């Protein structure tokens, strides 16, 4: 049984929702799954004034525990075409793991969100891939076997690089049924590959 970590940062709850869908998919494929978040860097008064969702029950991860999993699925919103600094800050503390090769051969994957259709979803995930490769991870995306990313009948996130959701400029749009389905598919896909590699 593969051990999968869904590691995320979510300011307004969209990525939190996607993270739980990813975890659901991984569990459906037989994985043991932990959902954890990275620490918030924004001062609490600023976060409250900005209406951040601060009541997220997922525990905060430690850098060292990343080595305990067979797969890590990273999730964070897009900030100006790149990953939110909270997740980047956490990842940038993994030098000790890198030096010891602790993540070599583990599966890595990512999902994201943006305010608009062309708000940097692909560039955000692509920006995380070099980090995974420097760690020697096996990168897995969201293949076109997931047919939900085909077609143009509705506004939706998602690409071969990973699942994503579009939040709207005011954050009022929640992940759609097809976006959540994509997240579940990606979680299951990662879990199956991780299980094969762990054998």
UniProtKB/Swiss-Prot annotation:
Chain sites annotated for binding NAD(+): 12
Positions with a binding annotation for substrate: 98
Known EC number: 1.6.5.2
Necessary cofactors: FMN
Domain Flavodoxin-like span(s) in chain numbering: 4-190
Cofactor note: Binds 1 FMN per monomer.
Record: residues binding FMN: 10-15, 78-80, 113-119, 134
Reactions listed under catalytic activity: a quinone + NADH + H(+) = a quinol + NAD(+); a quinone + NADPH + H(+) = a quinol + NADP(+)
MF-aspect GO terms: flavin adenine dinucleotide binding; FMN binding; NAD binding; NADH:ubiquinone reductase (non-electrogenic) activity; NADP binding; NADPH dehydrogenase (quinone) activity
Annotated coiled-coil segments of the chain: none
The organism's place on the tree of life at top rank: Bacteria
Primary enzyme class: oxidoreductase
Pfam families xrefs: FMN_red
An example Gene Ontology CC term for this record: membrane
The keyword Flavoprotein is annotated on this UniProt entry: yes
Transmembrane helix among keywords: no
Record keywords: Flavoprotein, FMN, NAD, NADP, Nucleotide-binding, Oxidoreductase
PANTHER family: FLAVODOXIN-RELATED PROTEIN WRBA-RELATED (PTHR30546), FLAVOPROTEIN-LIKE PROTEIN YCP4-RELATED (PTHR30546:SF23)
Family listed: Belongs to the WrbA family.
NCBIfam families listed in its UniProt record: flav_wrbA (TIGR01755), PRK03767.1 (NF002999)
Annotated HAMAP family: NQOR
Name the record gives this protein: NAD(P)H dehydrogenase (quinone) 1
Origin species: Rhizobium meliloti (strain 1021) (Ensifer meliloti)
């Amino acid at each position: 049984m593969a051990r999968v970590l869904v590691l995320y940062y979510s300011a307004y709850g969209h990525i939190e929702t996607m993270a739980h869908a990813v975890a659901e998919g991984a569990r459906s494929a037989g994985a043991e799954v932990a959902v954890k978040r990275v620490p918030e860097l924004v001062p609490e008064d600023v976060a409250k004034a900005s209406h951040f969702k601060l009541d997220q029950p997922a525990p905060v991860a430690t850098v060292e525990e990343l080595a305990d999993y067979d797969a890590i699925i990273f999730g964070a919103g897009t900030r100006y075409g790149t990953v939110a600094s909270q997740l980047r800050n956490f990842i940038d503390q993994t030098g000790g793991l890198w030096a010891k090769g602790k993540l070599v051969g583990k599966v890595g994957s990512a999902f994201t969100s943006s305010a608009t259709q062309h708000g940097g979803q692909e560039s955000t995930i692509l920006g995380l891939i070099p980090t995974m490769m420097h760690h020697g991870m096996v990168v897995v995306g969201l293949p076109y076997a997931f047919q939900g990313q085909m077609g143009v009948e509705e506004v939706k996130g998602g690409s071969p690089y990973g699942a994503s959701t579009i939040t709207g400029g005011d954050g009022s749009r929640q992940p759609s049924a097809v976006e959540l389905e994509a997240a579940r598919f990606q979680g299951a896909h990662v879990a199956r590959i991780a299980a094969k590699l762990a054998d």
